[in-house]
Amino acid sequence: LFNGKRLSIFTTAENEKSFEVTFTKQPDQLLIFWQNMELPLSLYTWEKGRLTVLVPAEAALLERSFIRVIAAAQGVISNDLLIPLHFDKVLNHIKELKRSDKEAQVLYSLMIDRFSNGDKNNDRPLNRLDVLPAVDFQGGDFQGIIDKIKSGFFNDLGINTIWMTPIAQNPETPWGYDEVVKTRFSAYHGYWPIHPTVLNEHFGTEDKLHELLDVAHTNDINVIVDYVANHLHKESPILKEHPDWATSMITDDGRPNVRLFDEYRLTTWFDTFLPTLDMEKREVREAMTDSAVYWLQKYDFDGFRHDAAKHIHESYWRLLTKKIRKNPKWNHLYQIGETYGSPSLIRSYVKTGQLDGQFDFNVYHSAVNVFGLAEGDMRELNDDLLCSLDSYGYHNLMGYISGNHDKPRFISVAGGAVSLKEDTKLAGRVRTITVGDSTSYDKLAALEAFMLTIPGVPCIYQGDEYGVPGANDPDNRRMMQFDGYCNRERAHLDKVKKLINLRRTSLPLIYGDVMPLYCDKDIIAFIRIYMGKIAIVACSRSNETKRVELSLPLAFKGNDLKNNFNCNFRTLGDSVSITLPAYGFEVLMN
């Protein structure tokens, strides 16, 4: 698992104003930083293979600051440690966390039009014969979200950050055409902006949006909004005034520059009616970053989810983040992007002066194959996870999803109701997609257990908490259901609530260092460690009961562990044996 090369470091104890670090092998180099400034030698000691670090007195001036530790041995670099401080003490109580603590977020992704209809007075479906109901407006709005916050829906689930789809003005007429089912498409989703600073009246008024944010914050919930900077709809008055702001729809060799996402990454159009903006032009960057900042100035948002991040020039991200950081009130903002590509491409946008994180689709795709398909191999997921940790850091702010509005529902893939080898969009347009085999609920729970316990920011896509089925767009965007669940759906919802509660209340699962413990074709196990507290996670993709034997790292014994999901386990010294049911998982904690 370690290939004999990994140097792992982890925190083993804390005493308010100091903490200890243990190493799996002797390092020959140490780097210790507080707020990205190297700590003086007087604040740490190295003795008998153990590092003791003192909290600097200056930390008392900041409610939240961080110490980072990294080591190396014979050219092999360790995992990085992130130690949060609460003023001049090591953070050691959940009650010291705030909603501005980015590592402590659990996101909930919702599509406004498909979430909850709280005000039928603003319902304005196109009601056209050439637009099927599945791709027309269905009435979800700001009032619906407000109602669900007030009802306790999000707090009961354990969510502390809501990600809403775009709220800017979109066209009132349908666009595109599907030849198979004979339909055009409304802009119910919000991703075809006409004007990036005009509110979409389908969702509510400016006052109602202010109310939504006030109610969310009163309930200790962040709200981040989806912002589309890559393109404008061809009917945009901005493009009519500045046609030169768009990239060419024709490539140099005469082909249509449409959906050439990798070949012409920075210039390709998403559709013939969605011109891509030329961000290499300074005036375009200024205008679109000003438009993004407008939403922060007018409304009290807590960050952005950025659409199509990899298709936008790096200079745009640097300019936007520079403008945001000029205002101290926005230091807490969380920016997460959407990029499909290699870890190196994704990482190029995740750095100082750009984005906090991006959604890690590579780990998600691997998890879908492993937990959802018979031919999956857990070792591939283990490799992809370690690659991501090495690429983005062991305390990254990447997004780890249960699904999203551009993917077929995992539960239907795992249940065999839809195949990844077919056109998953077409599947949902020509037949009714169900859950399929009922074991798919267990497989979805295992995937969600994995995503909610690894480092990063977990994200639940609306409906995945109870297991709504569906193919790809638009079938994966069915109207949200809040009651009338069947027994399997209720049981699944209870599991997800418990998993989210563990994530929200366990410092090892929020800030813990991570070490792999075991991996074979069917089982993966790892440990999260924070100041001597541990969480051991084991997940199985097998259709049979499996027992796994684990050896805990230095300094840990298993005699005070407790299970959370009723799996049988035994401990003897530093050894732990866990029996996992088919498609089962367990989280052991001390």
What are these regions (language model features)?
Residues 1-19, 25-108, 117, 138, ...:
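Carbohydrate-interacting/catalytic domains
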Residues 383-425:
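Aromatic-lined glycan-binding groove of carbohydrate-active enzymes
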Residues 101, 105, 115-299, 319-329, ...:
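Substrate-binding/active-site clefts of carbohydrate-active enzymes
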Residues 113-117, 168-170, 229-230, 302, ...:
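Short, solvent-exposed loop/turn segments at secondary-structure junctions
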